[in-house]
């Protein structure tokens, strides 16, 4: 983001600080998207409603507790290790809406006193704990029912996937003040970020992707 000297001098707000905050949020979401796209390519898929493909999902094929019982069973059968005693589901806010009215649902505050919670955790079904994220994958293309978005809920065990750790390649926010670089008249400041990030599925049987529709499928776009 480039900021002019006139903007910096005349604006009431500190635009360098604001740009840094906005780019920090964008950087986090971008890096999360890289991980999401990598892990969403797994081969173990359960389609809601007993369907056999994404294209054949219908309006009634929303998330239901039985789907997570099936996912947990598959993970246990594969000897997938648990994370703090449970498997973890990464769920979109739109599809978590479909589960919250289930009688089996346990809100996070009912067990948080005895169990450390994950950031974004919203509740639990059986031995599956749910972490809500807007980065959970959504498709809306020719592979989906016409005009409908399909949502991914990823259920994972320990060591199902990994992300990169490169020395010196972590997220860096870089602020250049007026007069930096090719700016002889001190007219431009810049704020930006850079990072190295990739993700890889390590053990396919240690993750299960559940695909479903939602009450919001007609209104939501892909991410």
Where are these regions (language model features)?
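Short loop/turn segments at secondary-structure transitions that flank enzyme active sites
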Residues: 7, 29, 93-97, 136-138, ...
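Sequence/fold signature of self-assembling virion shell proteins
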Residues: 55-72, 100-223
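Alpha-helical scaffold segments that mediate packing/assembly in large oligomeric complexes
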Residues: 6-78, 94, 217, 221-222
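Aromatic- and glycine-enriched pocket-lining scaffold segments that form the walls
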Residues: 80-96, 100-102
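Glycine-rich, often proline-containing surface loops adjacent to acidic residues and nearby aromatics
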Residues: 1-5
